[in-house]
Curated annotation (Swiss-Prot):
InterPro entries: WH-like_DNA-bd_sf, WH_DNA-bd_sf. Homodimer. Dimers bind to DNA, forming a protein-bound filament which may form a helix around the TubZ filament. One of its GO terms (biological process) is plasmid partitioning. This is DNA-binding protein TubR. GO terms for molecular function: DNA binding. A DNA-binding protein that is part of the type III plasmid partition system used to ensure correct segregation of the pBM400 plasmid. Binds the plasmid origin of replication, probably cooperatively, forming a ring or short helix with external DNA. Its effect on RNA expression has not been shown. Keywords: DNA-binding, Plasmid, Plasmid partition. Coiled coil: none annotated.
Length: 101
């Protein structure tokens, strides 16, 4: 299972990681902390098509969840999304240590 997760992580794009990182920094890590899609789109300034494509991918691999029922949909990091961000941070720290040596 961890091999599958590693493979999914390797295939993330810069846009994918940016959205995951933005949600992580803004602590959108639970349904009740979800943030409006429009707020995220305004902040990241991706094209509408690219933003939609990226969200669809992240939702399909269960890294983000969508809260519906209000006027506007909201997004949050799922447990898998949180693990992905934490793993990316960990790998970044390991790479920094290697560069220092």
């Amino acid at each position: 299972m961890s091999d599958y997760f590693e493979e999914v992580m390797r295939k993330l794009t810069i846009e994918d990681v940016s959205i995951l990182g933005w949600l992580f920094q803004n602590e959108a890590n639970a349904v009740f902390k979800a943030i409006k899609k429009s707020s995220i789109a305004d902040e990241l300034e991706y094209s509408t098509a690219n933003f939609r494509k990226t969200l669809n991918k992240l939702e399909a691999i269960h890294f983000i969840g969508t809260v519906t029922g209000g006027k506007e949909h909201k997004l949050y990091l799922t447990e898998y999304g949180q693990q992905a961000v934490q793993q990316a941070i960990h790998h970044g720290e390991e790479n920094e240590e290697v560069e220092e040596i």
